[in-house]
Amino acid sequence: MINTKEDFLLLIKQIEQKSGYKKPKAFGIARLDRGQLNKNKILQASFALINYEQNFGSAAIMLEAFMQRGVEIDFNASEFVQTLKLEDIDFALSCFKPFLEEDGHQNIDLLKIIKDKFKDDEFSFVCLFEDKEPLSVESIYLKLYLLSTKKVPLRSINLNGAFGLLSNVAWSDDKPIELEYLRANEMRLKMSNQYPKIDFVDKFPRFLAHIIPEDNTRILESSKVRMGASLAAGTTIMPGASYVNFNAGTTGACMVEGRISSSAIVGEGSDVGGGASILGVLSGTSGNAISVGKACLLGANSVTGIPLGDNCIVDAGIAVLEGTKFLLKDAEELAKLNPYFNFDKEIYKGLELKGLNGLHFRQDSISGAMIVALNKKAVKLNEALH
């Protein structure tokens, strides 16, 4: 029986000293949306609280709850997912007895809510021991939450194989519906006027279905940001041609009116113009993830296919690709901004210029030549809008 905080700390020590025990890197409890036809198929996992490299005592109590009822836990595996039973919650709350009347213990508060709302097979405990290729839908969602809540940096977590594990489903008011269910019940649903309004069909939900952004972040259309994106405070996502994919986003306040593809990152103070595209790792970059530096301007309908440093401009309507050849101007001034780069020729391929600062990519309107020169303009966002 745990009656004091000293008892609790002793229990945690005993659990963590068990042979093979490993502290998880991340853990949380998810509410599950299961398939309408296949109840074993997980369509979505929603987390209200994510723990990342913290609250190890809470993790130890939950893992001990499962071991108490005979669940085998492989601490050498990369992840552990277990459906919650009411007895698990009761055991955990009994261990947390010295803290039950105190404020500020979010994991305890969450358990109290789940106990009140408990239904069989609706909640799962999910933890990651190592960052390896995900093995379950629940662990994919945990990783997407880690990205979207900015607990881990973009491109720092393994999502290989996620597409293969997630089901392609219909989404109605942010709830997933099996396409097989709709086909099997189409006549009944339509003839009884119960056919759901389908908002979209995809493997990923929308960012705003799971994440509450900062007060100074604006997203003008929910469809424009996929779950797993990361938006820094002060970012504005305009309607129209804007889009931010999973494992992509901004690291500071930005204006986004174009497309930030998967694995692309945009730095603070940059402006992605209307219809501009930043290529992702699957769209013409030879697998090279693109980062756009601080205070850059990607003109309307431009295409950026190489990493950019700070204070760069890509003029409207042009494509800066790895193989695009550019005539270099202002070499002496550019060398001062990029002292570790040797500007020793007149013609460069785009890929050779990756990551350099102060570049202005443009096209000569008479000759048609692609030119890269010193950026002599300051890119500054309207502070009133961010």
From Swiss-Prot:
Q: Which reaction(s) are listed as its catalytic activity?
A: (S)-2,3,4,5-tetrahydrodipicolinate + succinyl-CoA + H2O = (S)-2-succinylamino-6-oxoheptanedioate + CoA
- Residues at the catalytic site: E257
Please identify the protein, giving its name as recorded. 2,3,4,5-tetrahydropyridine-2,6-dicarboxylate N-succinyltransferase
Per the record, the major location class is cytoplasm
Q: Which residues bind succinyl-CoA?
A: R259, G274, S277, A300, D315, A316, G323, K349, R362, Q363, D364, S365
Q: What does this protein do?
A: Catalyzes the conversion of the cyclic tetrahydrodipicolinate (THDP) into the acyclic N-succinyl-L-2-amino-6-oxopimelate using succinyl-CoA.
Domain of life, per UniProt, equals Bacteria
Give the UniProt record's GO annotations in the biological process aspect: diaminopimelate biosynthetic process; lysine biosynthetic process via diaminopimelate
Give the family this protein belongs to, as stated in its UniProt record.
Belongs to the type 2 tetrahydrodipicolinate N-succinyltransferase family.
Q: Quaternary state and partners of this protein?
A: Homotrimer.
The protein's enzyme class: transferase
Q: Which organism is it from?
A: Campylobacter jejuni subsp. jejuni serotype O:2 (strain ATCC 700819 / NCTC 11168)
Residues folding into a coiled coil are: none
Q: Where in the cell is it found?
A: Cytoplasm
